[in-house]
């Protein structure tokens, strides 16, 4: 029925086997274990001094200055943006917790 001899769709039709993704495709994806370990470390160790300063800058609305500082400390623009967003998220959670009380 669907088997034709020529063209792009030539040959015997088969259903494609769903394979597991390669290990290289997992890069950057946190496992549950790593996530929990990092949360415990963060709870015990707290924030680094530069992270506290970034949070202060974000509190007063100096987002660009906070990004510049993160970028200088972490080395790249993308890492700086990610850290700034992480710190902004922490501030939002803290504000939500204080409003809830």
UniProtKB/Swiss-Prot annotation:
GO biological process terms held by the UniProt record: translation
| Annotated keywords | Ribonucleoprotein, Ribosomal protein
What's in the GO CC field? ribonucleoprotein complex; ribosome
Taken from the record, one Pfam family name reads Ribosomal_L36e
InterPro entries in alphabetical order: Ribosomal_eL36, Ribosomal_eL36_sf
Q: Domain of life here?
A: Eukaryota
Q: Where is this region: Disordered?
A: 1-31, 75-101
What name goes with this protein?
A: Large ribosomal subunit protein eL36
């Amino acid at each position: 029925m669907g088997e034709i001899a020529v063209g792009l769709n030539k040959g015997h039709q088969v259903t494609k086997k769903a394979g597991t993704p390669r290990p290289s495709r997992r890069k950057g994806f946190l496992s549950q274990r790593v996530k929990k370990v990092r949360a415990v470390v963060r709870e015990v160790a707290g924030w680094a001094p530069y992270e506290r300063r970034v949070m202060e800058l974000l509190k007063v609305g100096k987002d660009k200055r906070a990004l510049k500082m993160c970028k200088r400390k972490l080395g790249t623009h993308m890492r700086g943006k990610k850290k700034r967003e992480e710190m902004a998220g922490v501030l939002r959670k803290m504000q939500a917790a204080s409003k809830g009380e």
